[in-house]
């Protein structure tokens, strides 16, 4: 596996989106505060801090594990950086610095790679993979609740300022980018997975995730208008089910028990919004059950609003929103079927080995125990 110039540009774009997302979240929170909407300001800030703090915890835990594996002592400067919310930026610095060296200093077309050059590419791929996992954590922990909040405010007031539109756009971009970036990193870091070559598989996977996610978020927003307590109870119930599912599957992502417990809590939260294979096994049945429940839940929420219409927001919005929910859900399921029917990373057939090479050894990395697609 080689870290290419295209991969480097994706990493650069990734940090640009990451920084933009943080700036817009802070901007929206401050704007709400100045307008006297203290609850919305606190919620926006809390979502941002929640996602960032969890990402910093995992980042520092991985730094410690990597140093221990290398036989080095844990450095206090790394702890200080993560306490100051600089862990992800530190990782981006190391990844971009080494990635530039790997992508531009060595000619990827030459077959005359020495062992040192191969190790450099492996190191960069591992660093970028760690970043993609952290971004996936932060996106779903912060971006999804933030997007629901902004959609709720938009429908409640019937209009929004530029900062709110910016927050919605950036949240969608962050979710889209982290999802595709995660897919690319997954395939690149695990040699037994087929590479995600071409634009079509990436777009198909992106639309599958984005459409099913948007449909569910709009449904949750409608439920919030119906009854906030019922909506929160449903989300907490789904979170609890996700945590139980993670414990039932006995995930083994972290070496530390406390971090593994946190990981399962985070997995449960992510499962509220979208499905991931949390154990790397055949999940045809669980995925089918997940999206059947998703369809039934969405139709149930829409039925309640159609049978008992509530004058809680501009009724002119309800018909377009209902159509959007149904269409995005159908399109999401359609792209899901196309993706798993044509582009799913089934384990490639075992290659024949000659007497010199022997049987290839699967490379050990964190991604192998992380969320699969």
Curated annotation (Swiss-Prot):
Signal peptide limits: none
A GO BP entry: apoptotic process
Keywords: Apoptosis, Cell membrane, Membrane, Transmembrane, Transmembrane helix
Family: Belongs to the XK family.
Membrane topology: Multi-pass membrane protein
Predominant cellular place of this UniProt entry's protein: membrane
Source organism (scientific name): Pan troglodytes (Chimpanzee)
Cellular component terms (Gene Ontology): membrane; plasma membrane
Superkingdom: Eukaryota
Family annotation (InterPro entries): XK-rel (IPR018629), XK-related_scramblase (IPR050895)
Compartments, record wording: Cell membrane
Pfam family, one: XK-related
UniProt keyword annotation of Cell cycle present: no
Protein name stated in the entry: XK-related protein 9
């Amino acid at each position: 596996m080689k870290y290419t110039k295209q991969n480097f540009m994706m990493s650069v774009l990734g940090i640009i989106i990451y920084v933009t997302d943080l700036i817009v979240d802070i901007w929206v929170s401050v704007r709400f505060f100045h307008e006297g909407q203290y609850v919305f300001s606190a919620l926006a800030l809390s979502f941002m801090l929640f996602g960032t703090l969890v990402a910093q915890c995992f980042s520092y835990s991985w730094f410690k594990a990597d140093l221990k594996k290398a036989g080095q002592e844990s450095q206090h400067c790394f702890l200080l950086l993560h306490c100051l919310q600089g862990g992800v930026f530190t990782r981006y610095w190391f990844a971009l610095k080494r990635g530039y060296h790997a992508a531009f200093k060595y000619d990827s077309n030459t077959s005359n790679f020495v062992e040192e050059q191969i190790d450099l590419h492996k190191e960069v791929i591992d660093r970028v993979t760690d970043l993609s996992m952290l971004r996936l954590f932060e996106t779903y922990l912060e971006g999804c609740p933030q997007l629901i909040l902004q959609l709720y405010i938009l429908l409640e007031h019937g209009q929004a300022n530029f900062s709110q539109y910016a927050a919605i756009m950036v949240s969608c971009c962050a979710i889209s980018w982290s999802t595709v970036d995660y897919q690319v990193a997954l395939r690149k870091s695990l040699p037994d997975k087929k590479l995600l070559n071409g634009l079509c598989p990436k777009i198909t996977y992106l639309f599958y995730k984005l459409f099913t996610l948007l449909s569910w978020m709009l449904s949750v927003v409608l439920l919030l208008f119906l009854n906030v307590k019922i909506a929160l109870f449903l989300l907490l119930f789904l979170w609890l089910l996700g945590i139980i599912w993670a414990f039932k599957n006995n995930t083994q992502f972290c070496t530390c028990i406390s971090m593994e417990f946190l990981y399962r809590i985070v997995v449960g939260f992510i499962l509220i919004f979208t499905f991931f294979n949390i154990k790397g096994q055949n999940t045809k049945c669980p995925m089918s059950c997940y999206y059947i429940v998703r369809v039934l839940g969405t139709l149930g929420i829409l039925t309640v609003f159609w049978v008992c219409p509530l004058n809680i927001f501009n009724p002119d919005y309800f018909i377009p929103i209902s159509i959007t929910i149904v269409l995005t859900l159908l399109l999401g399921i359609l792209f899901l079927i196309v993706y798993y029917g044509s582009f799913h990373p089934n384990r490639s057939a075992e290659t024949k080995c000659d007497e010199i090479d022997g049987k290839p050894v699967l490379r050990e990395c964190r991604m192998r125990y992380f969320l699969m697609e």
